[in-house]
Amino acid sequence: MLSRLARVQPKCQQLAHFSTSKSAAAAPTVKLWIDGQAVESKTTDFVELTNPATNEVIAMVPNATQAEMQAAVDSAKNAFNTWKNTSPLTRQQCMFKLQALIKRDMKKLAESITIEQGKTLPDAEGDVSRGLQVVEHACSVPSLMMGETLPNVSRDMDTHSYRIPLGVTAGICPFNFPAMIPLWMFPVALATGNTMVIKPSEQDPGAAQLLVELAKEAGVPDGCVNIIHGQHSAVNFICDNPDIKAISFVGGDAAGKHIYERGAKNGKRVQSNMGAKNHGVIMADANKEQTLNQLTAAAFGAAGQRCMALTTAVLVGEARAWLPELVEKAKNLKVNAGWKPDTDIGPLISKQSKARVLRLIESAKKEGAQVPLDGSNITVPGFENGNFVGPTILAGVKPNMTCYREEIFGPVLVVMEAENLNEAIEIINNNPYGNGTAIFTSNGATARKFTNEVDVGQIGINVPIPVPLPMFSFTGSRGSFLGDLNFYGKAGIQFYTQWKTVTQYWNESLTELKPQMSFPQLK
């Protein structure tokens, strides 16, 4: 695989994993996936797909036409009529096969992610693996879908409630986890009897394309999962289409709020995971070496392009003296193309992302922050045109600074200081986001106080990125989430299903002689 990846530089012209055809510009065009088939879009409006390490155009992504998007929904709607009545055991078997196929094609999926998104190959495999765990959880759907029964609620009367699928659902995915986020969505939706239309990010759609092909190979019927491509018009189509009953979204604040408001206004169920500013509180009694290693990895891994990246370190008390050692660890990280051996940090997804990160670093300098490590001007030999920013540490940051108020989404660690734990908790709770946080300490009482008082949805105790395994739910809160049912776990099953309750009365000798006009009193 590494030899194949070596051949992508600098032009990245072989993307055999795509269903593609050659456009006039000689770049392959990414196809739609409708009714179990790769479909060439008839649009004349395309978006360039570039390799972030080189900025070479490797494919053209269509902005699908309204007719093509409607065809995807119609396909999902037709498939739902049969799929909803398919035995949960049959759907379970599809999930068993899908997880085996994903394992088989792990390296192929990771290669696609590295070429399109930029993250390192080991990190790309981690992207796939964490999504795979959701597929494995979906394999237990017969148990997860079990309902509730109470016999003899009244004389000769029984009541039972059970979960039924919603219908056609939609998933709108971000660029930063091209495999994991689609796998948060469509396996749970399909396992519970729904069908789905997926809109992957136009910046890296290849992994999603591969995954739906694997779903077909696993026995998922045609039409149960479809892919459309596009930008704003595709998002609004999903929000407005009356046949789509629920929307799952992961991405930025502006899009997340728009999708939640527009989708909810149209009567849809919406779960919207948005921005974050995740704090790591460093206590002086923590294991210094382990803590600094964990903090470095959580801040700079995936070039900081994770919604659960630990972007803000709060050094408490004597731990403030640890900053020079943290800087030294970050200095030793290797920045290079994601397919290069021993790379720690790959490129940012786009030129626009790099420009935003550089703007926020510059704002920190102007607003009085210290910059003990500045990766703004890094040059990667052989990849001078890539979207690279080196590891950067901004120290002495105050809550009113732009670099703290805005989500940076790059390899930049903001460092703040606190006199004590109470002050650190106050900093976190005053921030509008509530996705994740962590504390590093060897004191159980400190950890317990932090857990009880911090207002954040996901907390790590000596765990830098506390993303729960899928038997639990991803529980970001406050400004990081809109909706009332989170992703995967029990909440995920609830999101993609609704209750139906049946009350039945059977009596061999009915004795009612006249209508009972008062409201029934069950005894």
UniProtKB/Swiss-Prot annotation:
PROSITE patterns membership: ALDEHYDE_DEHYDR_CYS
Sorted UniProt keywords: Mitochondrion, NAD, Oxidoreductase, Transit peptide
Catalytic machinery residues: C307
Annotated protein name in UniProt: Probable methylmalonate-semialdehyde/malonate-semialdehyde dehydrogenase [acylating], mitochondrial
Single GO MF descriptor: methylmalonate-semialdehyde dehydrogenase (acylating, NAD) activity
GO biological process: thymine catabolic process; thymine metabolic process; valine catabolic process; valine metabolic process
Oligomeric and partner information: Homodimer.
Residues annotated as binding NAD(+): F175, K199, E202, E407
Keyword Transit peptide: yes
Catalytic activity: 2-methyl-3-oxopropanoate + NAD(+) + CoA + H2O = propanoyl-CoA + hydrogencarbonate + NADH + H(+); 3-oxopropanoate + NAD(+) + CoA + H2O = hydrogencarbonate + acetyl-CoA + NADH + H(+)
Top-rank taxon, per record: Eukaryota
Top-level enzyme category: oxidoreductase
InterPro entries the record matches: Ald_DH/histidinol_DH, Ald_DH_C, Ald_DH_CS_CYS, Ald_DH_N, Aldehyde_DH_dom, MeMal-semiAld_DH
Lineage: Eukaryota, Metazoa, Ecdysozoa, Nematoda, Chromadorea
EC number of this enzyme: 1.2.1.27
Keyword NAD attributed: yes
One GO CC term on file: mitochondrion
Localization per record: Mitochondrion
Family: Belongs to the aldehyde dehydrogenase family.
